[in-house]
């Protein structure tokens, strides 16, 4: 799943920039004395400022008045965030949570935890290491695909945003130059990819530039006003926006890359090991150390490998494990010739899974979803699939990578669809957004371990749905389970144990049927995004543990549909809180 794309939002988490002084005064003036009333008012004020200072986020949620604005990516915004988080913590510590309703005690706990975690993250200079191939200043244009661009005014608003992006590109250059001076850089390998992405965009003719193409509906309007606006857009892209991108690319190639680090792990920057230990805790919502996570990954690899070998015996393969993997990677029967065929297969699988959903759930979201292709501008650099949740009347979308279909095996289609669409992220995140009597900060942010743990858990639900209806599809599911187990090993290996990129790639090649291109893109993702890949398997194992615990406790009274509805009814929560809620469920349902 792609994290901007997820969209800065899925909104697994969001970063906000606040004009805090005004907020403080407003809150002091409005805040009642009683803790319950004060907390309720604080939630409202908090959300108002989240929206006010995050115009892109506001637009995606359908709030009016923000469609021509963007947030700054400057260092000063980073410090505003820090000041606001300190203030939120200060306000919450003056409220007695025991005086709140049971629901608000949970809201209080989650809001405090989120801000404490965000504040701790600011003890590390993450703003110097934002550059990565998965998204950033180089693909701001992608936002247009999530906006309503129908009228001339819609396009005029979008143009105002595009004009602001030029300053953000310049800010990126300044921030990365400062990071270079202080020894905080992304690895050479990652930044080369970013420079390639920028050069790919700036080398296009204006008519083929993704920014210009985002205004394509203006041409069809065929009015003088539309023609004038389109001419202004063209002039700005050619005279200001692309030159700012070219300047950034030149800086990256001539100054940044030659002087950035060769090491790929976070341990290669000052205080990098402590930084990674924090990331491991925050992404998994546990106190597991990198060493403990590494060992857990090795155990899971051994367990899953045994299941994979059982499938190989079932198909009566007469070679060894490695030769079977080579067979899956290279035999034409496992691949479509065109992207159109691949997309049609994903859509057919989604419809098939939809029919099975009532066997596992009682509650369903109102929001629909679709299956569409990842834009070709970013497809070569990104992973196999990702999901973007519904926004402002727009459906949720499962994005499938159609680039080089000869590297996208058919046996991945079932497992990817259950993870990204239903019963995975679309089902989960749409239900979260539709929760009633839950504050907005819980509807549109969350904890990666639960979100991605549910996605991986959903892959196993495909077994009971019968969608792995031949051994190769089952091997595909096991490959994806193995993939997440290997993540525990390679992520900790690269960022904490000085593993090389080749070490990580080879572990994948030896144990999964994923293709070379997929593996390389995945490993590069882990290099650019330390710690995030740990969340999937840790979350999945906890959900499975809690399901088994509930089933054992309730015996014949256990109902899988009720259990699933229950654990999704709180939105995205830390794993320890999830366990508390399951324990309460067991007590309430024990006769």
Segments from the language model and where they lie:
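N-terminal maturation segment of proteins
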Residues: 3-5, 9-591
